[in-house]
Structure formats: structure tokens, C-alpha cells
Amino acid sequence: MSKKYLINLLFLFLLFFCNFLNAAEIQKNRAIILTDIEADPDDTQSLVRLLLYSNQIDLKGLIATTSCWHRDIVNPESIEKVIRAYGKVHANLSKHEAGFPGMDALLKLVKSGIPKYGMLGVGEDKDSEGSDWIIKILEEKDERPLWISVWGGVNTLAQALYKIKNIKSEVEVKNLIAKLRVYTISDQDDSGIWIRNNFPDLFYIVTPGDDYA
């Protein structure tokens, strides 16, 4: 086997490998997190784990919400606290693998949902920084699905969908809904069933809570 052949083979391998890396970068899943952080310790723990893998996904939002355990307050400052701790180890994480977002970039993704429980926070004049942010990201010219990972209540998403349905054409609503992927382990307020009843075509993974069908 000639030296030239080996060099060409190595070049093709490197070219394939670089293309593979570029494709992997392009195909990162977009995700917005809804969290009732401070309801109990688990969401803080989950956020720490998420940031350790934040180079593997394209984070688009970190939204503080209410839930059945956290009915009338949201805590974006607690999300920011975890991000600032992440900022202290960002350089070390980046030594091991590329692509970890910077602290400042993540802080810009922190938003607040309405500090009301469930459907009390859905309807006319119930828009929040968080619900408007979901719409903004959903309207971006990006063909990748937008995953909504729900760790608490889902009324911030419900309000975004309520507004979309009221300001968009039927075709626009259908196209935006088709881009959404919702994953929540259970219902933590009554807005989840409202979403499923009013948007039956929405991709929505859930084990319904005890109080909601």
C-alpha cells in the first residue's frame, strides 16, 4: 500500500469526520425548559445535570414557572444562581469537550412565567416574559423541532398557545404547532389537560396526573 494512498485515505477519513461533526452540530435539538425551581430541590439538581450536557443541545430558554407545589411565585433568580455556578467551571468543562455555552449567553435565556397557578394564568392579558419568549423562538426560521421540557406547571406554554391561536391564521397555527415537541412526566397544574383538549394534534408526551385526565 503506497504512502500516497494512505495519505489520501487519511484525508478522506478526516473530511468525513469533520462533516460528521458539522452535521452533529447542525442537528442539535432545540430545547426550552419550564421549571418550578424552588418548589423542592430536584429541579435545581436537574438544572445542574442539564448544564453539564449543555454542549449536546441547543438551549433556547430557561423559564421559571409555577406548579401545584409552587402556586403563586416564580424564581428566575434561582436559575441564574445555578448558571453563575456553572460559569465558574465553564473553562474546565471546555477543556474536555467543545461547545459549552458561556455563562452570559445562558443568563440571557432566563425568563419568568406568570406567577399564577394553572389556568388562572391563561387567557386575555395573561402574557408573560416566558410565554412571549416561547412564541419568539417558535417563530424563528429554523426547521428543527422545538422541544419543551416541562419540570413543573405548563401554563406558560398554555398561554403561548392561547395567544398564537388568537393572533395567527389557522394555517400559521397548524405550522407552529407542528414544530413543537412537549415532554412532561406528569401534570402539575390544570393547564396540561387544557392544552391537550384544545390542541389535539400537538406532540405531547405525558403520564397524566391523578387529578387530570
Q: What is the predicted function of each stretch?
A:
Residues 1-5:
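Positively charged n-region of N-terminal signal peptides that target proteins for export
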Residues 8-19:
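Bacterial N-terminal signal peptides
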Residues 23-213:
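N-terminal acidic, glycine/proline-rich low-complexity segments
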